[in-house]
Amino acid sequence: MAPSPRTSSRQDATALPSMSSTFWAFMILASLLIAYCSQLAAGTCEIVTLDRDSSQPRRTIARQTARCACRKGQIAGTTRARPACVDARIIKTKQWCDMLPCLEGEGCDLLINRSGWTCTQPGGRIKTTTVS
């Protein structure tokens, strides 16, 4: 005699497909939320990497990489010593001090070859930034 097809006597057997689709819907929504949260808002920047080298006396070399989501006509730059979206004209003409890269109360001067700028604090300390 051939075996008879088995039927489930569990009451939640019909709920399993529904639960499975709910689970996958939740997973898709969660992954979309994670993807959305990792996007930057337009016109903002974040620091991705920051390396400091203090091996030389009285001198610290810092390198940072920023990720920016700039609007049309803007490009990644520096404002008040933080990454920011600035007018692309500033970068194109190398007028670095126009983007206000120094902190409040510091003076900004272009390097002679326009490869960067210096920020001079009232006490005389000088911070030099070069663009690469």
Swiss-Prot record:
Q: Recite the UniProt keywords alphabetically.
A: Cytokine, Glycoprotein, Secreted, Signal
Q: Which residues are glycosylated?
A: 113
Expression by tissue, per the entry, reads:
Expressed in the subcutaneous, brown, epididymal and perirenal adipose tissue (at protein level).
Where does the record say this protein resides?
Answer: Secreted
GO biological process annotation, one example = negative regulation of vascular associated smooth muscle cell proliferation
Q: Where is the signal peptide?
A: 1-43
Q: What induces it?
A: Repressed in epididymal adipose tissue of diet-induced obese mice or leptin receptor-deficient mice.
Recorded coiled-coil stretches: none
Record-level GO cellular component terms: cytoplasm; extracellular space
GO molecular function (one): cytokine activity
Q: Which family does it belong to?
A: Belongs to the TAFA family.
Sum up the protein's function in the record's words: Acts as a chemokine-like protein by regulating cell proliferation and migration through activation of G protein-coupled receptors (GPCRs), such as S1PR2 and FPR2. Stimulates chemotactic migration of macrophages mediated by the MAPK3/ERK1 and AKT1 pathway. Blocks TNFSF11/RANKL-induced osteoclast formation from macrophages by inhibiting up-regulation of osteoclast fusogenic and differentiation genes. Stimulation of macrophage migration and inhibition of osteoclast formation is mediated through the GPCR FPR2.
The protein depicted here goes by the name Chemokine-like protein TAFA-5
Species: Mus musculus
Gene name in the database record? Tafa5
